[in-house]
Structure formats: structure tokens, C-alpha cells
């Protein structure tokens, strides 16, 4: 399953920080950012992606995050 999120992460350093935090909690997920996309995309791939938990981690670090419809 792949879930795509729209974020407001613009800086590569913040993206790396969030990736470290997300990978610490979800080591079996494949996670990456596409900061060149206008929606600052966060892609998460895993057997069962916990969208609300991903949003909580990103939001808890001061960024907007929502599932891209």
C-alpha cells in the first residue's frame, strides 16, 4: 500500500529530520519526500500504512500534513 501526503516541509534538513523520526517508528516502511513537487509530497509505502500516526508525527514537529486525495 502506498499513501501520499501533502506537507509544507520545504527544507531538506527538516525532511531528513522527519525521515529519521518516521523510520525509527516504522522501520519496515519505505518513506521519501518530493520537495520539488508543489505539494511537498511525503510518500509512505508499507503493508498497512497508519496514516493518522504519520500525520501525528509530522504535525507534532510543527508541519502541516494531510492525505493527498
Map each language-model feature to its residues:
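Short glycine-/aliphatic-rich beta-strand segments at the starts of folded cytosolic domains
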Residues: 1-11
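Short amphipathic alpha-helix segments
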Residues: 9-25
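Short amphipathic alpha-helices in soluble, non-transmembrane regions
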Residues: 18-22, 54-61
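Gly/Ser-centered flexible loop/linker motifs
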Residues: 27-30
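Conserved short beta-strand edge segments in small beta-sheet-based binding/regulatory domains
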Residues: 32-33, 62-69
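Short Gly/Ser/Thr- and Asp/Glu-enriched loop/turn motifs at secondary-structure junctions
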Residues: 35-39
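A generic structural motif
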Residues: 40-44
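Helix N-cap motif at beta-to-alpha junctions
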Residues: 46-51
Amino acid at each position: 500500500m502506498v499513501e501520499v501526503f501533502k506537507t509544507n516541509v520545504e527544507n531538506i534538513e527538516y525532511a531528513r529530520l522527519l525521515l529519521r523520526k518516521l523510520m525509527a517508528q516504522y522501520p519496515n516502511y519505505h518513506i521519501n519526500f518530493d520537495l520539488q513537487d508543489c505539494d511537498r509530497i511525503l510518500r509512505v509505502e508499507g503493508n498497512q500504512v497508519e496514516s493518522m500516526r504519520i500525520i501525528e508525527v509530522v504535525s507534532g514537529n510543527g508541519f502541516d500534513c494531510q492525505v493527498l486525495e
